[in-house]
Amino acid sequence: MGRGRVELKRIENKINRQVTFAKRRNGLLKKAYELSVLCDAEVALIIFSNRGKLYEFCSTSSMVKTIEKYQRCSYATLEANQSVTDTQNNYHEYLRLKARVELLQRSQRNFLGEDLGTLSSKDLEQLENQLESSLKQIRSRKTQFMLDQLADLQQKEQMLAESNRLLRRKLEESVAGFPLRLCWEDGGDHQLMHQQNRLPNTEGFFQPLGLHSSSPHFGYNPVNTDEVNAAATAHNMNGFIHGWML
């Protein structure tokens, strides 16, 4: 009697599942070995258990070389297909950007008043509206710039005026006592000159004794009546009496 067909589904019993895994694993490794020996094939087998334990078989001396060979064979076609796809996408992107650049260049020429022959009436009206909008924005920005400059100049003017007031105040404070001191000095000089004017002039009244004089002198020069009258007149004019008349 032959073996019954096993239903392919997950074995719920943990022990039975582990026993089945061990049997099938060993059988698979044996089949891989037989295939590599009988058919001279390069076989690599990698198995991970449900707990993450690794089981492997490689017919060559290096599993890494076999895996690299597999990657070159499997992913080379994918890379080639990807390269073709990328090239096509890049070409479409180039065409899109080229059309965009041509449109911008044409718009620039239209803004400069060039190549207007191909534009319709609606296009010309739209272009006119765009130019008017641009002019409004430019004038508004220019006006704002001038107002900002004017505000800065007014602020600087206020700062300079304030500095001027401070300097003027300091100058007035420093010069406030100078006129009084000047008057005091002028008054002192005037008083000194007044006292000098009041000093009696004895040069005309006392003369040195001359050796050639034949008449004796007693230390003064004889004064006649006219000189006395002149002295009195001087007293009346100057408001004071000479010392020799006291």
From Swiss-Prot:
Domain K-box residues, every copy: 87-177
Alphabetical list of PANTHER family matching this protein: SERUM RESPONSE FACTOR HOMOLOG
Subcellular location: Nucleus
Applied biotechnology uses: Combining natural and engineered alleles of J2 and EJ2 provide a wide range of inflorescence complexity that allows breeding of higher yielding hybrids.
All copies of domain MADS-box, residue ranges: 1-61
Name this protein carries in UniProt: MADS-box protein EJ2
Nucleus keyword on record: yes
A cellular-component GO term for this protein: nucleus
GO biological process, any: positive regulation of transcription by RNA polymerase II
Sample GO molecular function, one term: RNA polymerase II cis-regulatory region sequence-specific DNA binding
Keywords: DNA-binding, Nucleus, Transcription, Transcription regulation
Chief localization: nucleus
Function: MADS-box transcription factor that acts redundantly with J2 to control meristem maturation and inflorescence architecture.
Family matches, as PROSITE patterns: K_BOX (PS51297), MADS_BOX_1 (PS00350), MADS_BOX_2 (PS50066)
Gene name of the encoded protein: EJ2
Species in which this protein is naturally found: Solanum lycopersicum
